[in-house]
């Protein structure tokens, strides 16, 4: 079991208590589905299950052995001058499926 401690200072006079994260792997005695990891956050006396099934991104190395890594959604805190002090999800990457070429425009 891995142990992480996060403590963060947030603007707008908002304080956040330290958050303790435990990355726990499935054991034979667990009733979780196969290949399932989960993250627990402990804030004071409260324990929260943050993520039950984590998506994995598979990478193939030169020997065709698969390696897995956790895919994480990034979040950002907008500046206090913007009128919001909460977290908001990162914007999706733009899709460039439409290609504009000179001379192909219609009237």
Swiss-Prot record:
Return the GO cellular component terms, semicolon-separated.
mitochondrion
Report the subcellular localization: Mitochondrion
Q: What is its main location?
A: mitochondrion
What's the protein called, per UniProt? Uncharacterized mitochondrial protein AtMg01060
Top-level division of the source organism's lineage: Eukaryota
- Sorted UniProt keywords: Mitochondrion
Q: What else is known?
A: A stretch of 270 kb of the mitochondrial genome is duplicated within the centromere of chromosome 2 resulting in the duplication of the gene. The expression of the duplicated gene is not demonstrated.
């Amino acid at each position: 079991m891995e142990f992480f401690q996060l403590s963060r200072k947030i603007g707008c006079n908002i304080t956040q208590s330290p958050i303790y994260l435990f990355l726990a792997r499935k054991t034979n005695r667990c009733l979780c589905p196969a290949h399932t990891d989960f993250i627990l956050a402990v804030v004071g006396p409260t324990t929260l299950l943050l993520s039950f099934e984590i998506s994995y991104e598979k990478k193939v190395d030169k020997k065709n052995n698969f390696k897995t890594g956790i895919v994480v959604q990034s979040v950002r805190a907008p500046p206090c001058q913007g009128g919001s002090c909460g977290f908001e999800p990162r914007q999706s990457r733009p899709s460039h499926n439409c290609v504009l070429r000179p001379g192909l425009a219609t009237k």
